[in-house]
Amino acid sequence: MTNLEQQLSQKLEILLKQTALSITDQQKEQLIKLVLLLNKWNKAYNLTSVRDPMEMLVKHILDSVVVSPHLQGKHFIDVGTGPGLPGLPLAIVNPNKHFVLLDSLGKRISFIRNAIRELGLDNVEAVLSRVEEYHPEQPFDGVLSRAFASLKDMTDWCQHLPKQDGYFYALKGLYHQEEVEELSEKFTIQQVIRLQVPELIGERHLVIVK
């Protein structure tokens, strides 16, 4: 184990102790490996503005996995996933759920496919496509994203993706009431959850829409 791996491992333990999440040792190792892969690829492909692997643990890994207890169902899509966030961390800690990770940028999907191989994940599929051109064989229990500027954009662009009784899970920083007022009448806010992300400065919310 390299010095960086050791530091990341210790840091992850400290962060997880501040949550109610139950994560196996193997999953912890996979999360660390994901940070190392992202750090390596980021130098060449500029996948994230976060440069420090320690910071990646908080802003990318913890910020993703804290959503895990709120997911209902088995079959999810992460739209505008970027370098696989929140989809890859969620897939690691939910091996019994299946995730499609969608992005329109080739270098991001190449990274995700490499990560799937390196991490030995069999519950993730990476798809290179724009969301409006992607038509799945079966609809999803949940549509996840931390990429959309507004709830209206997310529900408008992704309304063909969830099942009749499926949900949208929007990961957001600040939560503004105006966003709710912009929503089409066919969508309703089910829940707004203030997420506790250890050591993250600023608010994080999960907005669940149906």
Swiss-Prot record:
The keyword Metal-binding does not apply. The keyword ATP-binding does not apply. Pfam families: GidB. It comes from the Bacteria. Its EC number is 2.1.1.170. GO terms for cellular component: cytosol. S-adenosyl-L-methionine binds at G80, L85, V131, E132, R146. Keywords: Cytoplasm, Methyltransferase, rRNA processing, S-adenosyl-L-methionine, Transferase. GO terms for molecular function: rRNA (guanine-N7-)-methyltransferase activity. Transmembrane segments: none annotated. It catalyses: guanosine(527) in 16S rRNA + S-adenosyl-L-methionine = N(7)-methylguanosine(527) in 16S rRNA + S-adenosyl-L-homocysteine. It is found in: Cytoplasm. SUPFAM superfamilies: S-adenosyl-L-methionine-dependent methyltransferases. Belongs to the methyltransferase superfamily. RNA methyltransferase RsmG family. Specifically methylates the N7 position of guanine in position 527 of 16S rRNA. PANTHER family: S-ADENOSYL-L-METHIONINE-DEPENDENT METHYLTRANSFERASES SUPERFAMILY PROTEIN (PTHR31760:SF0). This is Ribosomal RNA small subunit methyltransferase G. It comes from Pasteurella multocida (strain Pm70). The lineage of its organism: Bacteria, Pseudomonadati, Pseudomonadota, Gammaproteobacteria, Pasteurellales. The gene is rsmG.
